Regions:
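Substrate-binding/catalytic cleft of secreted carbohydrate-active enzymes
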Residues: 55, 179-190, 194-432, 441-443, ...
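Small/polar glycine-rich anion-binding or flexible loop at a beta-alpha turn
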Residues: 446-448
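Secreted/periplasmic carbohydrate-active enzymes, especially glycoside hydrolases
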Residues: 1-205, 210, 214-218, 246-249, ...
């Protein structure tokens, strides 16, 4: 039995409680292998040949000497054997034997974000019978960092289009169901990210496996504090006793993942520049990493010295960076050029940034090789730090808090919400990353006598909507995001105006009196109209649409189907301002384990089967039981026809 006593303030975000990740009890023969002892370094490639170093340990926990044969096989991404060797091993009782060998793979298929090719190593040990066998996936790729060339993956420059990510799974809480972990990676890839910073603790093994399979680069991060506390019951109370063991565990567990490019020793650490404590701890942690892996860079996320009043960035930050291979800057993008002048060999990246400064960040990163990328806080919404990204309308004399109280429950700073949908800042980021030619959003008027206050991590109160009943004739601010020199704006086919785009922010703003209909923004190339986007006023609710990300799932509780619920008008257009109470039912070989929406302050239970839509949408998460068959999900709302969808389990 496991008893959990999780009391006090042990984290700055929602950490979860109990056993929320897979726990495996491994029973082995006396002569056995261990996945975490096995390291396959496939980071050396020259021409059409990869040189692979394989290290492992053979254990004999018995008292008798054993003569065995160790067989090592390497299989290509297509499952073809490309290398094999068998060697005899004599191992005395109660001893361990290190195993090391080097071999070449000709014409290797390199792992990359666009082509994440994975090889497989199969190790087996046999005496009179098979004693043990393990399978270790790995990727062949090279990783290089320099101020002159930037970050190179397989010899090619690549800017890190990154997002920070906490470990929770939104409406599911902290539980790391395999499909939920995989979906996070899919959402990041689908929205232009090629890298993730695991903030600020180790991700699940399955999350890393998904990053390997789908091609998402990873900064693996281990600590949010060292000896000095951020919360009374946080990890600081265990740091001296456990930090070396825990960072070794991170590296031993994760070093075979080709997706991982950096090891991070901490986030916004209080002692980062303290003398001599900060440097002593940093060197110790880095030495432990290098004991188990020297093929990757070390890093940390370093913030300003708001907590050290006698320190300054110019005078003291060098001590926080001097032992690191790559320097992570939390919100300090204004220091990039000054620091490059002082330390021209320093390799930098934005380990945390905010959406409203994204253009300034990316403009610098795009043109400077010593800046290798940026990681927004955050890619996906997460539980805890409630309302960190709020935007409020305040009267004179009112002040905005850093966090929001009940009923706010999620941070609201993600580009992507709990339903997996893009928020306005994600469409803006698409312009920065050249994934979209033009985007359009609408900001309603602030109440008379008030002002809009955007918290530092927040975004202006804008919507991808032209549904503003009751605002007829009132002035809306329409933001057009584009890289074109000029854009035009039309309302119901009337040209409202033509404006130059501010190429520092990729924005042109128009003031438009509201009237229902079609709002259309168009890019101009010279005098020629090119790409366009539009927002249209929709009708009243007429139907419910259900869309499952997977309509066929395994009869296994580690699989899920995320079913999106949308309220449409008679023309099958999403109604973006629609809030409708729903009732969800399921029947068959599974059930709904969570339901809700993307709102940051809708505190009804995630287990409730009566969520409301938020901005026209909600989501139901369906989990199968262990039987093959079908699951039927039905959703109803007052005055609308019931909708149903069938999910097959196999």
């Amino acid at each position: 039995a496991v008893k959990v006593v999780n009391e006090g303030l042990n984290s700055r975000w929602y950490a979860g409680s109990g056993i929320y990740r897979h726990v495996w009890l491994m029973k082995t023969d006396k002569v056995h292998l261990d996945e975490w002892d096995t390291f396959i370094d496939a980071s050396k490639v020259e021409g059409k040949k990869a040189t692979v170093d394989l290290h492992s340990i053979l254990h004999n926990s018995g008292k008798e000497k054993v003569t065995a044969h160790l067989k090592i096989q390497i299989f290509s991404p297509q499952g073809e054997e490309v290398y094999s060797t068998t060697q005899p091993v004599n191992i005395s009782g109660e001893t361990n034997i290190p195993i090391s060998l080097t071999f070449d793979i000709k014409k290797p298929e390199l792992w990359s974000v666009d082509s994440p090719s994975l090889y497989t190593a199969h190790l087996s040990v046999k005496s009179k019978k098979l004693s043990d066998e393990i399978t270790v996936p790995f990727g062949i790729r090279t990783v290089e960092f320099s101020a002159e060339k930037g970050f190179l993956l397989n010899g090619k420059p690549l800017k890190l289009k990154g997002g920070c990510l906490h470990h929770d799974n939104g409406l599911l809480g902290a539980v790391a169901i395999n499909r939920a972990e995989e979906r996070k990676v899919e959402l990041m890839k689908a929205n232009g990210f090629n890298a993730v910073r695991c903030s600020h603790n180790l991700p699940s093994e399955y999350f890393l496996q998904a990053c390997d399979r789908l091609g998402l680069l990873v900064i693996d991060e281990v600590f949010d504090q060292w000896q000095q506390a951020k919360r009374p019951q946080d990890y600081h109370q265990f740091f001296d006793e456990w930090s070396e063991h825990d960072i070794a565990t991170m590296v031993r567990r994760d070093r075979n993942h080709p997706s991982i490019i950096m090891w991070s020793i901490g986030n916004e650490i209080a002692e980062r520049a303290d003398e001599p404590t900060g440097e002593i701890i940093a060197r110790k942690l880095i030495a432990t990493i290098h004991k188990y892996d020297t093929s990757r860079a070390t890093t940390a996320a370093v913030n300003s010295f708001w907590d050290r009043r006698d320190f300054s960035w110019e005078k003291d930050s060098e001590r926080a960076f001097r032992n690191l291979d790559v320097s992570g800057y939390n919100y300090q993008w204004k220091e990039y050029e000054k620091d490059h002048a002082r330390f021209p060999q320093r390799i930098m990246y934005g380990s945390e940034s905010v959406p409203k400064e994204a253009a300034q960040n990316w403009n610098l990163i795009d043109k400077n090789s010593y800046l290798i990328g940026d990681f927004v806080w955050t890619a996906l919404d997460y539980l805890g730090e409630a309302g960190l990204a709020h935007t409020l309308e305040l009267a004179p004399g009112e002040h905005s808090p850093q966090f929001m109280g009940w009923p706010w429950y999620n941070a609201w700073c993600g580009d992507i919400d709990f339903c997996g949908d893009k928020k306005p800042q994600s469409y803006y980021r698409d312009i920065l990353w050249k994934r979209r030619d033009i985007s359009l959003a609408v900001q309603p008027p602030v109440a008379k006598g008030k002002r809009e206050d955007i918290n530092y991590w927040g975004w202006k109160n804008e919507f991808l909507s032209w549904n503003w009943k009751g605002y007829e004739g009132e002035t809306m601010v329409v933001h057009v995001y584009s890289r074109s020199p000029k854009v035009r704006l039309y309302l119901n086919n009337r040209l409202l105006g033509e404006k130059e785009v501010n190429l520092d922010t990729y924005t042109a703003s128009f003031e438009v009196p509201y009237e229902p209909g079609q709002l259309k923004a168009v890019n101009l190339k010279g005098k020629k109209e090119t790409t366009s986007t539009e927002l249209c006023t929709t009708g009243i609710p007429a139907m419910i649409r259900l869309t499952a990300d997977h309509t066929k799932i395994k009869a296994d509780k580690n699989d899920l189907s995320y079913v999106k619920v949308e309220i449409l008008d008679k023309n099958e257009k999403l109604i973006p301002d629609c809030s409708v109470p729903l009732e969800i039912k399921s029947a068959g070989k599974g059930s709904v384990i969570a339901a809700g929406n993307g709102s940051a302050d809708d505190m009804r239970s995630f287990r409730s089967l009566k969520p409301k839509t938020f901005r026209g949408k909600a989501i139901a998460i369906v989990q199968p039981n262990t039987e093959k068959g079908t699951i039927t999900l039905t959703v109803s709302a007052e005055g609308l026809p019931e909708a149903a969808i069938v999910i097959e389990t196999y």
